[in-house]
Every structure is written in C-alpha cells, then in structure tokens.
C-alpha cells in the first residue's frame, strides 16, 4: 500500500502543472525544449501509473468474483481533458478501492488457513477424605469424576460457536438393580452452549448468547466455581464493547417461573488506569417476582482496584482492594449490607518464585435477623473454593455463619520446589462480624501441585480446622476437623 500512497502524493503537486500545459501555451513558449520534454514524459508516467492502478483493481475484482465495470473491460484510455481535481479524485478512489479489496483477500486467506473446528477437553478425578463435622471418628471418603469435551466452531473469523458437554458424578452414584448397567446418564448435560459474534458492524462489539460461564473480577460475587464437580453456568446474553478496556452488559435467567421469573442483570467495567493498574466498577441486580418470602429485588455494587509494580531487581509488589455494598428488598425485609477485601502480595525473582500474600476479608453480619432489616452480606454466585479456606466451610454466605457475617485474616505463602513442583501453606483466622461469641477458629491448608507433563497435573491438599467457641456452638462439636484430597487432571 505504501507504493500506491506514495505515488499519489507525488502526483498531487505535479498534476496542476502537467494537465494545464495545453491551456497555457505561453508557459510552453517560454520554456526550453528540454523542460517541455520532461513534462511530457512525466505526463505519460502519470497516465501509465493510473492505468496500472485500474488494471490492478480489475484483477482484484476478478479474483474475488465481483462484477467488473464495463469501463474496465474495454481497456484503459488516456487522461484526455481531465482536470487536476478530477484526476486527483479518481486516483484517491482507486487507491481506497484497491486497499479495500486487498484487505478482503487477506482476510479470506486467513479464514481459509484457520481451522474451522477445534476440540479440547479435560478429565479429572478427585479422591476426598473428610471429617468436618467436628466429631472425630466418622470420616467420609468419596471419589469424584468430571469430564468435559468442548467443541469450538469458527464458520467465520468473527463468529464462534461453543458447545461443551459435561459429565460430573461421584463413583457409585449410578442407580438401578445393577448399577454397573446404569445408562440413564443423569449427570450428563451441556455445561456451555452459546453463539459469539465478534466485531459487530466493524466495531469492538461482541455478543454472546446462550448457556455460558460468567466470571468477573475477583470472583467474590460471580465466578465459575470450577472446583465443584459440576461448575456453574448461566443462561444469558452478554454484550461487550472494547478490548484492553471494556464494558460488559448482561442479563441471565436464573429460573423460569412464568410471570415470576428470577433474573440477574449486570453492568461491569474493566478500565486500564496505566501500566499494571486497573479499576473495575460494577453493579448487579437480582430480581425474583415471586410474592412472599422469596420476593427479591437487590442491587449489589462495588469497585475493585488492583495492580502491581516490578522493581529493578525483579521483585514484584501487588495489591487488590475491593469494596461492595448491597441494598434492596428480600421478602418483607430491607437489605443494607457491605463487604470489604484487601490483599497485598510480594513475589520474589529467584527460580523458586516465592510468593507471600496478606489479606483481610470482611462481610457484614446481622445480630437481629427478625427485625425486618437484613444486614448480613450475601455473596451471590461466588467462586467459593477460592476464598475462606480450602475446607469450604464458609462457601454459602451468609447461611454458613448463621447471618453473623465473617472476618477472615489470612496469610498465604507459596514457592516452587522444582521446575514441576510448587508447594504452599495458607493460614486463616476466622471470626464472626456480629454475635455474642465471635471466635470461629483457625484453618491451615497445605497444598502441593506437581506438573507431570504439559497435559497432566497432580494436586494434593491437606487441611485442618481448629474450632473456637462460636464454631463449636453452631456445628455441635468441638474436635478439630480434617480434610485431604488427591486430584489427577488431564487436559487435551
């Protein structure tokens, strides 16, 4: 494209002199014979380049199967009596049309080389041993298995179709007289099935329609809950505008209930502040039109700010701050609750990549749940295994603390023991935000991740929870709780 553009610029300042020569004989008479010959040669060069551009345009249209205009089929004429403005306009139109057709051919070549279908998947099996009722001696052992196959179709460069089938079950959960012959497939379903349109009308606009995962920000409110044996997905519509910074607007149907549907609406902004720092303001609206205690109209809004800075020696210091508020109505109660989270991170530059995180999460509680005011914060649809300890004793908030809220002070450390092994230790101190007895207890989680090869990963975790008074009262036991797991995961 530089050749065409550069030539058109060169022609621009010469056109007037060349094309006006026949109308200005005085100039020719005063000019030398050599100058006249040079100008005539330049005029021929302009005409030759013009014809080359017209010929290239005709060939490009033929390659693309587009209709060739009659004026191109009969050959290419001379400049004739064209004025400088007319010739300049024609060259500009030719250049723009050639650029358009070249871009179109390049795009078609990329689409031809792009694979139309892509199949990926993951199969994982996890053994869990748990004694978490705070009464020693009655541990439970179960083997979980989850399999996913994901088909990605690309009929065009700007169109994708995603279909992901999932089977998630516990070993021995098949039913029937002889479970080994079970063929009911109760646990098989579509985890995701959606259409994605990109670059709508040539803009940075993307649309996703169908069953899909919704995961935003830290995951405190909306996460895929990938640790679960089924995972979470929503039936919804998402519009996204932008790339490096973007705005998402979505609606999801939680339950089809006729005229009393349960819906979730959301607006999420991811804005780049500067290198390494971002801000994410958002608001979610939950709606359930059912009358009575199930009636729901609750707005949750917040702001998340996070980033990191790297020193000259490679040391990384990061932070994440988030504040959230809730207001609305649940049943006949008024809602007014809040949550705050802060995390500070350090990562070293050595080959062991040591990382230390200090954090604090606070969820408001309610010590008078029958007074018509709900002050206990609800975490909506979180990525629950990510927060509040790996034992998952506080996965459903505020129910798991009896509306008492939660205060979690945490210290987490991780490092690489080798190129394929990473180890970590997480320690939590839990208390209630509201209540006569606030002490919940302390949890320690040890984790090891071993990457066997590029496709296979082995995870091990061992956890202990030592209860305090509030936990002993609510759970009815006073012994420490234990849990361990071993998970094998293969991706393809």
Predicted regions and their residues:
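N-terminal periplasmic/intermembrane-space "pro-region" immediately following the signal or transit peptide
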Residues: 26-138, 352-356, 368
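Bacterial N-terminal signal peptides
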Residues: 12-22
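Flexible glycine-rich, low-complexity coil/linker segments exposed to the extracellular/periplasmic environment
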Residues: 369-405
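Surface-exposed loop and membrane-interface regions of Gram-negative outer-membrane beta-barrel proteins
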Residues: 126-146, 152-207, 215-224, 329-335, ...
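Signature for the C-terminal beta-barrel architecture of outer-membrane proteins
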Residues: 201-207, 222-370, 411, 416, ...
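Exposed, low-structure sequence patches enriched in small/polar residues
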Residues: 397-430, 473
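Outer-membrane beta-barrel "beta-signal"
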Residues: 479-492
């Amino acid at each position: 494209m530089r050749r065409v553009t550069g030539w058109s610029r060169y022609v621009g300042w010469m056109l007037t002199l060349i094309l006006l020569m026949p109308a200005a004989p005085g100039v020719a008479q005063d000019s030398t014979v050599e100058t006249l010959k040079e100008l005539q040669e330049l005029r021929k060069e302009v005409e030759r380049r013009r014809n080359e551009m017209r010929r290239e345009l005709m060939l490009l249209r033929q390659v693309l199967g587009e209709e060739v205009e009659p004026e191109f089929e009969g050959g290419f004429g001379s400049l004739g009596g064209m004025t400088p403005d007319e010739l300049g306009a024609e060259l500009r139109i030719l250049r723009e049309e050639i650029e358009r057709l070249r871009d179109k051919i390049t795009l078609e070549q990329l689409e031809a080389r792009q694979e139309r279908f892509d199949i990926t998947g993951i199969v994982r099996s996890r053994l869990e041993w748990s004694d978490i009722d705070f009464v020693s001696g009655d541990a439970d052992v179960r083997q979980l298995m989850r399999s996913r196959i994901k088909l990605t179709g690309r009929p065009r460069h700007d169109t994708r179709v995603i279909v992901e089938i999932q089977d998630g079950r516990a070993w021995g959960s098949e039913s029937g007289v002889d479970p080994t012959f079970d063929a009911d497939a109760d646990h098989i379903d579509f985890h995701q099935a959606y259409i994605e349109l990109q670059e709508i009308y040539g803009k940075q606009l993307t649309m996703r329609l169908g069953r899909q995962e919704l995961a935003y920000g830290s995951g405190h409110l909306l996460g895929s809950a990938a640790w679960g044996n089924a995972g979470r997905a929503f039936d919804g519509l998402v519009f996204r505008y932008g790339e490096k910074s973007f705005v998402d607007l979505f609606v999801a149907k939680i339950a089809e209930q006729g005229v009393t549907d349960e819906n979730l609406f959301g607006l999420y902004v991811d804005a780049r502040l500067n290198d390494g720092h971002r801000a994410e303001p958002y608001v979610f609206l939950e709606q359930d039109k059912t009358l009575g205690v199930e009636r729901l109209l609750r707005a949750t809004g917040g702001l998340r700010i996070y980033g990191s800075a790297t020193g000259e020696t490679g040391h990384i210091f990061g932070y994440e701050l988030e504040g959230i508020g809730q207001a609305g109505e649940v049943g006949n109660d008024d809602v007014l609750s809040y949550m705050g989270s802060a995390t500070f991170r350090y990562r070293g530059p050595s080959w062991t990549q040591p990382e230390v995180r200090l954090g604090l999460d606070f969820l408001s509680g309610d010590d008078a749940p029958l007074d018509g005011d709900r002050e206990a914060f609800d975490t909506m649809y979180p990525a629950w295994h990510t927060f509040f300890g790996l034992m998952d004793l506080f996965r459903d908030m505020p129910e798991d603390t009896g509306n008492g809220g939660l205060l979690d002070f945490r210290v987490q450390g991780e490092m690489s023991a080798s190129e394929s092994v990473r180890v970590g230790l997480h320690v939590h101190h839990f208390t209630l935000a509201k209540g006569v007895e606030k002490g919940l207890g302390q949890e320690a989680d040890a984790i090891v991740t071993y990457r066997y090869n590029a496709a296979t990963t082995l995870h091990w975790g061992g956890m202990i929870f030592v209860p305090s008074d509030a936990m002993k009262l609510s759970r009815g036991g006073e012994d420490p709780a234990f849990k361990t797991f071993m998970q094998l995961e293969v991706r393809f």
